[in-house]
Amino acid sequence: MKKVRVITAEEAALMVNDGDTISTGGFVSCACPEALSIALENRFLETGHPRDLTLFFAAGQGHRDGTGGDHYGHEGMVKRVVGGHWDRAPKLGDLALANKIEAYNLPQGVITHMYRDIAAHNIGTITHVGLYTFADPRNGGGKLNECTKEDLVKLVNIEGEERLLYKGFPINVCFLRGSYADEYGNCTVHREIGPLDVTAQAQATKNSGGKVIVQVEKIVQGGSLDPKLVKIPGIYVDAIVVGSVEDNMQCLGMPYDGALTGEFRIPVDAIPPIPLDAKKIIARRAAMELPQDAIVNLGTGAPEKIANVAAEEGISDKMTLTVEAGGIAGVPYGGTQFGASANAMAILDHNVQFDFYQGGGLDVAFLGLAETAPNGDLNVSKFGTDRKSVV
């Protein structure tokens, strides 16, 4: 293998051209390639380029404070956004609500599978997920505003069954986060909360003829990494950027915690209790519905506090709590560390976790919502103007 190019974040930003489709890694506030996104934002603010980008991501990225996806939230920088969760990037949400960008909200798990299908050069991702919801073309096809015209979702009939076809498209550049890279570009994610989508995103970009750029903590001798820990092989990687300590935080603004990577386990009673407020009361009532030995998914918002309640009550080991980022068992964290799990028994790829979810493997799920109607209809996709965000 040839040695990989090691460049600065500013040099990486120059590899992005006007009109490119760029995919970014990360899950909420965790594993965000901040050095790369900051450099690209600065280049645009200084020169007006690159412009008219298409931004493509699965989980929302950032902390509603100008980080993550908000680095792309400037008029003219992006022309289209295709995302699974917008809430963490309110600047992007504002552009969508103002009809200044084309905007799509597609199911998060479907996007994780789209990466795989783009890599495999499949015609698209065919699934039952999204039928009869806002992602169904009969109900808007995931379009969020009036200026969004192109249909990315098509209703198809296969063997007499309705399915949705989510159309794939090439990815020109992807920005990813790794932990260590060797001299040949092989990258681990052993200090991140999980592998997330890095393998699939890198494959999709490489097989689109695009450029894979990975931000890491450090570079080590070639061939010295445990091959079982390498999630981005060097054959996919075009360039490595070594980020600063601040830009390589495990989760934004949070120091490294080995309990979230499986490096060590912590006593459950060492996890600080959360304050008693309205959301904790909701979580305590919801926790009363936790079946013993059930496989559980906890969503963001009030549901994430159920994990804290279970830990406080000493019942975390009575069921298996999971989060879509990939954690199996343990205690899922909330807030800035949502997506991470302390004391996990396993940490899977994001798309693999969704394979299990979409096939009905869960016994129960506790999910957040914006509005509910008396008949049980739920709005989980658009909040009011006080939030100014699209989920």
Placement of each model-derived feature along the sequence:
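Conserved alpha/beta enzyme-core scaffold
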Residues: 1-391
